[in-house]
Curated annotation (Swiss-Prot):
The VP2 protein is one of the two proteins (with VP5) which constitute the virus particle outer capsid. It is the major target of the host immunogenic response. This is Outer capsid protein VP2. One of its GO terms (molecular function) is structural molecule activity. Belongs to the orbivirus VP2 family. GO terms for cellular component: viral inner capsid. It comes from African horse sickness virus (AHSV). Keywords: Capsid protein, Inner capsid protein, Virion. The gene is Segment-2. Pfam families: Orbi_VP2. It is found in: Virion.
Length: 1051
């Protein structure tokens, strides 16, 4: 292999310059993006950055929220950072990560190189040196005075709003002034002149866990299907009387647009159809609900469903976007057929002869149809006459069954009044179109034998439905019908059939009537007894009139319950049954039940929209309301020590609509806002709405302030916390989120050994005095908490421990390497056993971790009056991602003081050993694939756009042959910050096989390597260009498959 490596700098590639292709890398000025600076933010001419080869970036105008959560695939890009190189060299293993991506470069065959398009110009790489080439982005700092400029503007805006006559603004202004005071107090103690933090990783990781923001209560508002008759601002919910509105056209559920998860699922169904992944997503969503569940066993497998959908979806004719939203397949075929007909009156009887020459081509089409489809559609022949007689008899029978009153019936895929005389030109056309569509679909239909469904009914029914989403949703219901018949409800919660029904009924609440009207199928589905409630958020559309409803609110307050107490009569008999079954070595997945079954009280956090329900009708046919809870009463569950919750009535009269990014945002009660770190401590977090702080465009737009950011600061102020003001708001919000989480978790799990025994109310009130922590990466945060709780002071390799804790083959050994955990595991005392609940945090709070939703119930140790026991907790708790809200509330109560040093009996010791083994061997999944797997540098660009700007780099790792495998790092850019590059590449540069760093910035060279690098000239046919030549000396460039060989050894 060659011992020299050449990098050519030229204006552009010219014809007949093949001599230059000997260079290993070519950097040109073609396609260079213009640099643009505005208000101190260094950026680019962003419209020039769209769809560049090698960069996973589409339109710069796409919102950052859509970029993160909706851009599913990048049409390829070279790896953002090939961590596998570090893993192989440093750890000797291939780690399954989620930060690789597909390539979107181009093979430039004329010169035998691979082309990419970074912002500083087109580049071409020799294939043998390309696999370890990647992009890096540097977000730049800005003056802290610029960062803090929003404070005054925000206060002026709030004061202006408070000047209006509107209830509640006085409290808002008071809270805003407390926030302002805390912000300026922080500023007094901050000495930096420029933004001090830009690390992307903390934001990246908490975005994956959906913790970059705050939560506030959903408003459960009366559905517009009801007219309130006795609802007033002073009347209690239980006193409400409602009138049902007459049902009109079946529409999508009112709650649909307010449910982000359901909305995303619907968008995926429309785009991706009923693939197996979509069917799984439908089941995963519906499995959370139980409005139609029962005890029936479900035998409909996912494979069977997939086969059903594979056949049923062939009946669906999606709208043709390029021909207008109302242009369905039937309309297109009908219009095409009419074009070939002579001019005729469609309301008159169908009569036509071959006579005139103008009719010849029409009859030729009729003859061709007969040859191709074996159906005679000649209007003068017997087939059409027989069809007229059959349809006329059908219409007469339908009208007689309707007390001889006309009604619409489905004929040939369209609706016709029974009072019409059948046999017109229009009727003939509809008949022919129906035959054409049926013939076309039959050619597409997969071979599948339906038990109950009829192909012709399916076809005509689907043709009448409006919208692809409705068609696909009803395909799932039709599959249930064909498999089970009319009885499609009452299956166990979480089963395939139950989950499908739950999802479809949320999308289309009145689907039963539409299935009956369009397909002639009567489904045995009970009318829902609960009152129709729609779930509303800040972004919902509210009526200009008053709307009424309720919300859940929760918090923590000191009361009679003691932290040092055992779980008492709130535990159900199922706890003892579970204990017995585990003693008999029965498998957890086989014996575990819904966590609610282990308690006797009712929290109603699973189905909050059903707390108030219809209790029948009064003599005036008003719907009477009853409730499982009493409005305004504060409940303290015996499950917890200081936790409280209640239902409060709300009215939308005092909602003020504000405009933000061309959308309406309603002002909810700010006192309810909670930062995610605190909101997730409440079991009722599932009744709250997560509001993300992903604001603005994905790049090139600086957001100085926003309503969401203001609300987040108010949420912090509610708990006496303030974020830092010496860095950009994105890094500041990420930092305070991780700081609060660290302080809270450490305080909770250090209580026993510190003998403080504080309840959660006390811990939260102490946040104002807690240390302000900062973590450059999520791994630093994770390990910091781990070592603080376990009182471990060793120097630990971050990457290694996180990798080995994820690996079930190594996790046990790593856990037992911590002295405190090993002591708890060996101890015979109850207090030490309860400390083992920290394993829950160790496992589920790892970076990138996800959990199989079908196995979301996991064990937690509790101290009952009968001894050490285990209950199941829900690691999702009806939320979209893994959440602490389903398990952390249960560790508030410890045990009675007298039991703290009680020795465990043999059965309890066996339970504790089983508990440790469970978490030591629990398999985990990676979260964020594929949607978040290529977003890291995009997030860096977004952060830089909201601070001092961004710089674009390309980094290349060159393998070298020597006694040990080695790497040379080369960084390319327009204005390179060498110190930043060295920091970013420290994992490579600190390795013993590193040969150092070479930086190429335009025509400038910085050599910090062990090799000789010369800046030479290369002459080629009238052009003199620069050539950077790296001489290998005793080293040899190449071994082009070195990385593949390394990985092969590591696997």
């Amino acid at each position: 292999m060659a011992s020299e490596f050449g990098i050519l700098i030229c204006d552009k590639l010219k014809e007949n310059t093949l001599e230059k292709t000997n260079c290993d890398v070519i950097i040109t000025g073609v396609g260079k993006v213009g640099v643009h600076e505005e208000d101190g933010v260094l950026g680019y001419e962003w419209e020039e950055t769209n769809y560049r080869l090698g960069l996973c970036e589409i339109e710069n105008t796409m919102s950052i929220s859509d970029f993160v959560y909706k851009q599913i695939r990048c049409e390829g890009a070279y790896p953002i950072l090939p961590h596998y190189v570090t893993d192989v060299i440093k750890y000797g293993m291939v780690i399954h990560r989620n930060d690789h991506q597909i390539r979107v470069d181009r093979d430039e065959k004329s010169i035998g190189k691979i082309q990419i398009q970074p912002y500083f110009g087109d580049m071409y790489f020799s294939p043998e040196y390309y696999p370890a080439t990647f992009i890096k982005r540097e977000s730049l700092p800005i003056s802290v005075d610029t960062i803090r400029g929003y404070i005054g503007a925000r206060m002026r805006g709030i004061e202006a709003r408070a000047g209006r006559i509107r209830e509640g603004d006085g409290n808002l202004l008071e809270c805003a002034r407390r926030w302002e005071k805390a912000a300026y107090e922080r500023i007094e103690n901050e000495k930096a002149l420029r933004c001090v933090a830009h690390e992307t990783d903390p934001t990246y990781q908490i975005l994956k866990k959906q913790r970059f923001g705050f939560v506030y209560p959903h408003y459960y508002v009366l559905n517009t299907n009801y007219n309130p008759t006795t609802v007033t601002r002073t009347s209690r919910i239980n006193d409400w009387l409602l009138k049902e509105k007459t049902q009109g056209v079946v529409k999508t559920a009112e709650a649909f647009s307010d449910n982000a998860e359901l909305k995303t699922l619907a968008e995926r169904m429309e785009e991706e159809e009923l693939t197996e992944d979509i069917i799984r997503a439908v089941i995963r969503y519906g499995a959370k609900y139980a409005t139609r569940s029962g005890m029936r066993e479900d035998t409909l497998s996912l494979q069977e469903l997939d086969r059903y959908c594979d056949s049923l979806t062939t009946f669906v004719h999606k709208k043709k976007k390029d021909e207008g939203d109302d242009e369905t397949a039937r309309t297109i075929i009908r219009n095409q057929w009419i074009k070939g007909m002579p001019r005729m009156d469609f309301k008159k009887e169908m009569k036509i002869t071959r006579g005139p020459i103008a009719n010849w081509s029409f009859f030729m089409s009729i003859d061709a149809f007969k040859r191709n489809n074996k159906v005679d559609i000649n209007p003068n022949h017997q087939t059409w006459k027989d069809h007229i007689k059959e349809v006329t008899d059908q219409m007469n029978r339908a009208q007689q069954g309707n007390n001889n009153k006309p009604l619409k019936v489905q004929i040939d895929g369209v609706s016709i009044l029974t009072s019409e005389k059948y046999g017109t030109v229009g009727h003939w056309v509809d008949w022919v179109v129906d035959l054409i569509m049926l013939a076309q679909v039959k050619m597409l239909i997969k071979e599948y034998k339906f038990k109950r469904l009829n192909s012709q009914n399916l076809m005509s029914g689907m043709n009448k439905l409006v919208g692809a989403l409705r068609c696909y949703a009803y395909c799932l219901i039709l599959a249930l019908y064909d498999y089970y018949g009319q009885d499609i409800e009452g299956f166990k919660k979480g089963s395939n059939s139950s989950a499908i029904l739950e999802t479809v009924i949320q999308m289309f609440p009145n689907f039963k009537q539409e299935i009956q009207a369009n397909f002639g199928i009567n489904l045995n589905i009970k009318d829902k007894k609960t009152i129709a409630i729609r779930r509303a958020t800040m972004h919902s559309d509210f009526s200009s009139n008053e709307e009424y409803g309720y919300k859940f609110v929760f918090g923590w307050a000191a009361r009679g319950e003691e932290v040092l107490s055992n779980y008492g009569d709130v535990l159900s008999d199922e706890v003892e049954e579970l204990f017995t079954k585990l003693r008999k070595k029965e498998h957890w997945d086989k014996v575990v039940e819904d966590p609610e079954s282990y308690f006797i009280d009712e929290l109603y956090q699973k189905n909050p929209a059903e707390v108030f329900y219809s209790a029948g009708y009064d003599t005036d046919q008003n719907v009477v309301i009853d409730g499982k809870m009493t409005e305004g009463v504060t409940y303290f569950s015996k499950r917890f020590v200081s936790y409280w919750y209640r239902v409060e009535k709300i009215t939308t009269k005092h909602l003020e609509f504000l405009t933000e990014e061309n959308r309406k945002v309603a002002q909810f009660d700010f006192e309810d806002y909670k930062p995610m770190a605190i909101g997730e401590m409440g079991i009722h977090a599932s009744t709250y709405k997560y509001e993300s702080l992903l604001l603005g465009k994905n790049r090139g737009q600086k957001v100085n302030d926003s309503i969401a950011l203001c609300n987040y600061d108010l949420a912090l102020t509610n708990f006496g916390v303030s974020r830092r003001q010496d860095c950009c708001w994105i890094s500041s919000c990420s930092a305070i989120e991780l700081s609060m989480r660290a302080n809270i978790i450490i305080a909770i799990f250090r209580r026993i050994e510190d003998k403080r025994y504080e309840n959660f109310a006390k811990i939260l009130s102490g946040l104002t005095q807690q240390q302000d922590l900062y973590f450059p990466t999520y791994k630093h945060y994770y390990l910091f908490v781990l070592q603080k709780v376990l009182r471990d002071e060793r120097r630990i390799d971050l990457n290694r421990i996180c990798t080995e804790l994820f690996d079930t083959q190594r996790r046990r050994g790593i856990l037992l390497s911590f002295t405190a955990l090993r002591f708890w595991n060996d101890s015979e005392f109850l207090g030490d056993a309860l400390m083992m609940n920290f394993l829950h945090r160790v496992v589920f709070e790892m970076e990138n971790v996800d959990v199989d939703y079908g196995k979301k119930w996991h064990p937690l140790l509790v101290s009952s009056e009968k001894g050490l026991r285990v209950i199941a907790v829900d690691v999702f708790n009806s939320m979209m991602g893994v959440s602490t809200s389903g398990w952390l509330p249960y560790v508030e109560r410890i045990c009675s003081e007298s039991d703290m040093r009680r020795r465990l009996n043999a059965d309890e010791l066996e339970l504790k050993r089983w508990f440790f083994d469970y978490y030591a061997t629990l398999p985990l999944e990676r979260r964020g694939e594929p949607r978040l797997s290529f977003k890291y540098e995009g997030l860096t660009t977004w952060i830089g756009s909201n601070c001092g700007g961004v710089r674009d780099y390309v980094v290349q790792l060159l393998p070298m042959r020597k006694s040990k495998p080695g790497l040379l790092c080369i960084a390319y850019g327009d204005d390179v910050n060498v110190q930043w590059v060295e920091h970013e590449l420290r994992d490579f540069l600190m390795h013993e096989g590193s040969l150092g760093l070479v930086v190429i910035s335009g025509k400038m060279l910085v050599n910090k390597s062990k090799l000789r690098v010369r800046n030479l000239k290369i002459y080629n046919r009238g052009t003199l260009d620069s050539l950077f030549l790296i001489s290998g000396g005793n080293y040899t460039f190449g071994n082009k498959f070195l990385l593949s060989k390394l990985m092969a050894k590591a696997e």
